[in-house]
């Protein structure tokens, strides 16, 4: 025993305490109660009308305790000034969600959820169709069924937040979009909204920023008020905390997105003082904006400002100030890129890893998920894999005040997850199904898509060829077989040249590129890793028709948005993830028509797809066509 260090002894004691707390929910410690024959191909033709490092030490813990004690003293001296915030708990979604359920009711609901016992309901709304999924339970009620806010004053905001917001926007009015989202966001349900346009980015950000601030305010005030009561009567017992202080996690793609969020947060709080604001501005903004006006609007918006995707920031609230760059364990909100947070967590092979600061996240917000998809989706999955876990160390936790559902490892089922994206995608939808497990329910908004086939501005023959495959796992092989056996021979016979082969998946791109190399097929290629000098050479050779085929990846298009000259025809190896990319790609032959190297009626685009491609196909062909095209009896659909 004497060979053990003080830290090792403390850690052993902490682990023993956790076991004891979880082992018997009926016993009390001193101040707590543990609580998934190829058919003949048929053709359908349709004529279209034109139309900070997360480290802590004993000094940080002591500082946090002193600050908390100071805030409690302020509260005691202020008397009953917070009584104006008192709302009956049964009318406040915050209390209904986090305080009402017992661990037994939660355990029963979790079992139903894991067994797939989910009630589904589709409702028409102003944003299209919303699918609401809940675990049926007579006893468990984590949401207010009557919650339907029409104005900011209906959101059950803390009064000081409401006053600050109304000083900026006196009417308090919300748009139809905000009202529809707010009734689920502020009701603590999980939300996936994948139709955020460039015009409503700010509306969505304003809404989730309000929610994040409100949650932090309610958590902190609730804890401080109870601490004030305990200071006067130590016989009282409150279960009102998690293991660590951070309660809200915001995941964003770039430093500029973080800058916009923090500026909105500061504006809405009306904080008297913001510590480290100059440092924040220096590190998260840039002096000169250099983006061509010829680039699409969504591109200019996404890549505005500082586009660095490696950052993390702690934000701490006190009653009168906001501190930026606070240590994670002293922070209320953590704002980070998935890459930045993954680097802080460390790899699984690292001896020293730390992610305890994610143990008590109650609201997780992912904005611009489509941009994160084009970075590295695995980073996002990695972060959520390490969220709401039992902490390895105590970090100064007062276990007598830890909520029972934290001790029972049920917190991920009460965590609210909000995800916003410009479009839906397979990975985004999978995240919704596997990570958004809130027992209060989850809502996915499904917009009615008109499609983009007749919005190209000129005549081009658009052919969609369905590739037959027996299972999802066989899709890559089936697509490659169709491409190499059917389309490549046609390409080699075509003396016209100017064929752009667009490949969404980098792995498919590598496979096709290697096939071209093995078969000695002349081509050029541009992917996200191609050097600028090689890009210039490839574009010149392709335009001059010295190379008749160009391989082009989706991520290269996302980050560069090239408009190639010399394109006469397009083959899409699979449907683009973003329907806007389909529009941009199919418009490329227009330049060849203008340059006189392509007849006006000779432009063609061919898209390979499978029955499993409904998600990317729907915004391209429209909601009315997609089911028949993916599941109908015909394999070829042509739009002229």
Curated annotation (Swiss-Prot):
A Gene Ontology molecular function term of the record: rRNA binding
A GO cellular-component term linked to this record: small-subunit processome
Gene Ontology process terms (BP): maturation of SSU-rRNA from tricistronic rRNA transcript (SSU-rRNA, 5.8S rRNA, LSU-rRNA)
Record Pfam families: Utp25_C, UTP25_NTPase-like
Intracellular or extracellular location(s): Nucleus, Nucleolus
KW Iron (keyword) present: no
Biased composition (Acidic residues): 53-68
Principal subcellular localization: nucleus
UniProt keyword list: Nucleus, Ribonucleoprotein, Ribosome biogenesis, rRNA processing
Coiled-coil annotated residue ranges, if any: none
Region of interest: Disordered: 24-72
Physiological role: DEAD-box RNA helicase-like protein required for pre-18S rRNA processing, specifically at sites A0, A1, and A2.
Family of this protein: Belongs to the UTP25 family.
PANTHER family with a match to the protein in the record: ORF PROTEIN-RELATED (PTHR12933), U3 SMALL NUCLEOLAR RNA-ASSOCIATED PROTEIN 25 HOMOLOG (PTHR12933:SF0)
Record-given protein name: U3 small nucleolar RNA-associated protein 25
Gene this protein is translated from: utp25
């Amino acid at each position: 025993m004497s060979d053990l260090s003080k830290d090792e002894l403390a850690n052993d004691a902490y682990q023993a305490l956790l076991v004891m707390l979880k082992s018997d929910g009926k016993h009390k410690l001193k101040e707590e109660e543990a609580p998934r024959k190829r058919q003949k191909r048929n053709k359908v033709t349709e004529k279209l009308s034109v139309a900070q490092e997360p480290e802590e030490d004993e000094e940080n813990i002591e500082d946090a305790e002193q600050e908390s004690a100071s805030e409690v003293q302020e509260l005691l001296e202020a008397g009953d000034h917070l009584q104006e915030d008192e709302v009956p708990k049964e009318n406040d979604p915050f209390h209904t969600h986090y305080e009402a359920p017992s661990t037994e009711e939660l355990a029963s609901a979790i079992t139903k959820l894991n067994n797939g016992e989910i009630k589904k309901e589709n409702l028409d709304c102003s944003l299209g169709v919303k699918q609401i999924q809940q675990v049926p339970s007579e006893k468990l009620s984590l949401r207010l069924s009557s919650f339907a806010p029409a104005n900011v004053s209906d959101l059950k905001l803390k009064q000081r937040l409401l006053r600050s917001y109304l000083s900026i926007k006196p009417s308090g009015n919300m748009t139809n979009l905000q009202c529809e989202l707010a009734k689920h966001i502020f009701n603590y349900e999980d939300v996936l909204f994948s139709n955020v346009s460039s015009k409503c980015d700010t509306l969505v950000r304003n809404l989730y920023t309000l929610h994040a601030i409100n949650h932090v305010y309610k958590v902190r005030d609730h804890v401080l008020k109870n601490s004030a009561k305990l200071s006067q009567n130590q016989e009282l017992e409150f279960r009102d905390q998690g293991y660590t202080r951070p309660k809200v996690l915001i995941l964003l793609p770039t430093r500029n997105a973080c800058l916009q969020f923090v500026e909105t947060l500061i504006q809405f709080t009306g904080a008297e003082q913001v510590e480290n604001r100059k440092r924040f501005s220096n590190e998260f903004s840039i002096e000169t904006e250099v983006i061509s006006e010829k680039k699409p609007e969504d591109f200019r918006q996404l890549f505005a400002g500082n586009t660095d995707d490696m950052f993390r920031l702690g934000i701490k609230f006190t009653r009168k100030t906001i501190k930026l760059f606070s240590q994670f364990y002293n922070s209320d909100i953590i704002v980070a890129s998935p890459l930045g947070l993954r680097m802080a967590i460390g790899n699984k092979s690292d001896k020293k890893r730390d992610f305890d600061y994610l143990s008590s996240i109650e609201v997780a917000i992912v904005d611009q998920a489509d941009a994160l998809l084009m970075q590295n989706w695995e980073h996002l999955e990695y972060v959520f894999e390490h969220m709401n876990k039992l902490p390895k160390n105590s970090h100064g936790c007062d276990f007598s005040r830890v909520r029972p559902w934290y001790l029972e490892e049920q917190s991920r089922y009460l965590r609210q997850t909000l995800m916003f994206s410009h479009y839906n995608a397979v990975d985004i939808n999978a995240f919704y199904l596997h990570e958004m497990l809130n027992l209060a329910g989850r809502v996915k908004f499904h917009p009615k898509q008109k499609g983009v086939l007749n919005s190209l501005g000129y005549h081009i023959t658009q052919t969609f060829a369905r590739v037959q495959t027996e299972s999802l796992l066989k899709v890559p092989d089936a697509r490659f077989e169709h491409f190499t056996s059917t389309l490549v021979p046609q390409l080699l016979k075509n003396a016209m040249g100017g064929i752009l082969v667009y490949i969404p998946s980098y792995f498919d791109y590598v496979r096709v590129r290697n096939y071209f190399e093995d078969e000695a097929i002349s081509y050029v290629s541009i992917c996200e890793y191609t050097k600028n000098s090689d890009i210039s050479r490839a574009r010149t050779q392709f335009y001059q028709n010295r190379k008749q085929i160009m391989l082009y990846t989706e991520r290269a298009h996302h980050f560069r948005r090239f408009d190639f000259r010399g394109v006469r025809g397009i083959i899409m190896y699979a449907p683009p993830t973003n329907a806007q990319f389909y529009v941009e790609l199919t418009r490329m032959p227009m330049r060849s028509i203008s340059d006189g190297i392509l007849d006006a009626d000779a432009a063609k685009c061919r898209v390979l797809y499978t029955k499993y491609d409904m998600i990317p196909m729907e915004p391209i062909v429209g909601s009315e066509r997609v089911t028949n095209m993916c599941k109908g009896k015909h394999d070829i659909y042509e739009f002229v």
